[in-house]
Design a protein with these regions (language model features):
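C-terminal "cap" of GNAT-fold acetyltransferases
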Residues: 39-43, 77-80, 84-91, 95-124
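Acetyl-CoA-dependent GNAT
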Residues: 1-53, 64-66, 70, 74, ...
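Active-site acidic-Proline motif in GNAT/NAT acetyltransferases
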Residues: 51-53, 57, 85-86
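Internal amphipathic alpha-helical segments of the cytochrome P450 catalytic fold
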Residues: 7, 56, 90-91
Length: 124
């Protein structure tokens, strides 16, 4: 199988309250230095954003649960994400869902200023 992608919206009364974008690719295709034998499908959570006025209503948990379930259906045994260093609210949320910091970091310059990010991973 090739790459798979999904984009979800959480909507209430025609208002978008949250978004989640995730994908899976065989053998860590976007990171050859971390390739795994046998073409293992690896999930990647690209974004999970909740309207600040909707925080604490279970929307993030519902979107995350759906993403993790979809990863499993796609045959992923693990998934990764990148979170901004210092974003303690997001890191805490991810840890509550079972994600763990891996110790890997990167600097993203694609939006102009340097964004320092930490990798998190979860076994499914």
């Amino acid at each position: 199988d090739g790459e798979k992608r999904s984009f979800m919206l959480a909507v209430r009364d025609d208002a978008v309250l949250g978004i989640c974008h995730f994908s899976a690719a065989p053998n860590n295709a976007d990171r050859p230095e971390r390739a795994t034998p046998g073409g293992e499908m690896v999930g990647r959570l690209h974004s999970l954003y909740i309207d600040p006025d909707a925080l604490g209503q279970g929307i993030g948990h519902a979107l995350m649960s759906h993403a993790l379930s979809t990863f499993a259906v796609w045959g992923c045994e693990r998934a990764t994400l990148w979170v901004l260093e210092g974003n303690s609210r997001a890191i805490s949320f991810y840890e509550q869902q079972g994600w763990q910091l891996t110790g890997d970091t990167k600097v993203d310059r694609s939006f102009g200023p340097e964004l320092h990010e930490q990798e998190m991973a979860i076994c499914l």
